[in-house]
């Protein structure tokens, strides 16, 4: 007598092995046969939601292509080692310094603004003379 777990050729003809538990079908053919015979297991979207809320014809959102990360001066691929400058561009290791790529960002002014916001202005009261 044949065990229930003994592998037999699939009756679906797919070339795989089936079991008696699955009516001599492999797992793939068994899943297909179960879905064909019982419509309750099939996934169908609910019609109530689609009737109450009409579908809107919104324009398809196009995914923007991934920008390749290249140096702003020599156009060499920088990958993960790219350096983003305060001027907003990406640079390689040799062009990352502001002097190398003629950076238009004003570092002195940004430093002055940072100090002005961080340090309070301290003034002594005016001295009165007799």
UniProtKB/Swiss-Prot annotation:
| Species name | Arabidopsis thaliana (Mouse-ear cress)
The UniProt record gives the binding positions of Zn(2+) 2 as: 71, 74, 92, 95
Name the source's superkingdom.
Eukaryota
- Positions that bind Zn(2+) 3: 85, 87, 101, 103
- Zn finger regions (A20-type) covering which residues? 4-38
Q: Give the ZnF (AN1-type) ranges.
A: 65-111
Protein name as it appears in the record? Zinc finger A20 and AN1 domain-containing stress-associated protein 10
Query: What keywords is this UniProt entry annotated with?
Result: Metal-binding, Zinc, Zinc-finger
Q: Name one GO molecular function term.
A: DNA binding
Pfam families listed in its UniProt record: zf-A20 (PF01754), zf-AN1 (PF01428)
**What gene is this protein a product of?**
SAP10
The protein's role, per its UniProt record:
May be involved in environmental stress response.
Q: Which GO terms describe its biological process?
A: cellular response to cold; cellular response to heat; cellular response to salt stress; response to manganese ion; response to metal ion; response to nickel cation; response to zinc ion
């Amino acid at each position: 007598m044949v065990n229930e777990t003994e592998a037999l050729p699939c009756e679906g003809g797919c070339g795989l092995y089936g079991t008696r538990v699955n009516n001599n079908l492999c797992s793939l053919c068994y899943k297909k046969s179960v879905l064909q015979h019982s419509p309750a297991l099939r996934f169908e979207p609910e019609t109530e939601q689609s009737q109450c809320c009409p579908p809107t014809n919104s324009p398809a959102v196009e995914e923007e292509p991934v920008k390749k990360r290249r140096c702003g001066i020599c156009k060499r691929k920088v990958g993960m080692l790219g350096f983003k400058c305060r001027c907003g561009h990406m640079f390689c290791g040799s062009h990352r310094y502001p002097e190398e790529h003629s950076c238009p960002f004003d570092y002195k002014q940004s430093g002055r603004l940072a100090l002005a916001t961080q340090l309070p202005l301290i003034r002594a009261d005016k001295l009165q003379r007799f």
